[in-house]
């Protein structure tokens, strides 16, 4: 039986909240519905950026973030004319503020109990902690969903998610799968644009396309120990710094950072069993023409946005956590040895049932 689910994702790019409706059995059947993106207001974005604070402030921020997710659900349900209030489950990822799997720590803020109370629907959250506690990298978590979506596509196939951190899912014949973080995605570019020009991003990649890549700095970036590690592996958003490009012009700085993201993806192809013919790109970075150009130049394969195969790039991560919520409810695996490095296929997530929650927050 298919569950009616809303998946919620707040990514490391800090653009806003993605909300997506789907029906799924948590296995091989997925029927996709409406989706929306609700941008963060400036106040919330600034607080998430400066999240290292006292426990009181963190708790207040968690509530503000959760209430923003309630707004996203409301916007999505208003868009869904035929579904009404008939939702079985919500998959609530939350917002990652710490990811340190080597020390078995990962933290996504967002109050699943409060969300279940405010919406009146069962909520599954905290997807990553169990994987990290059992020795996994806790990321990436979308590959099992990618595998279902790509069931009828030619293999081998690679899906690249260009969020704040970039990660790939490699899909081979006979169900083979490999996934890992390749390096920075949009994070360094966005941080550079904010620091230098007060802008959220390099819109369309226009500034990068007017600049020149500093090859020496690019080479130094690629000497980071992360790139010599075997897969699966994962990164924290803030693992790389902007200091190497601090003396470059605005255009050259963002061009060099864009080349770094693309070259890190190119290097990741050395770790996959067989080079794919096509790279499907999802995440906000697919709108960056400079990044897409760099990927095509450095990879030597066809590079396409996921919309070319009928997927919604802005909704994919939210859909994934809706799908994973149903798998969690059924006790099915969310991560595999080949996706996070965990020893055995592992389930996870924490369930809050709306019917059992008292009005502690009123």
Model-derived features with residue positions:
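Extreme N-terminal starter segment of soluble prokaryotic enzymes
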Residues: 1-6
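Glycine-rich phosphate-binding loop plus the immediately following alpha-helix
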Residues: 17-22, 32-50, 123-151, 158-226
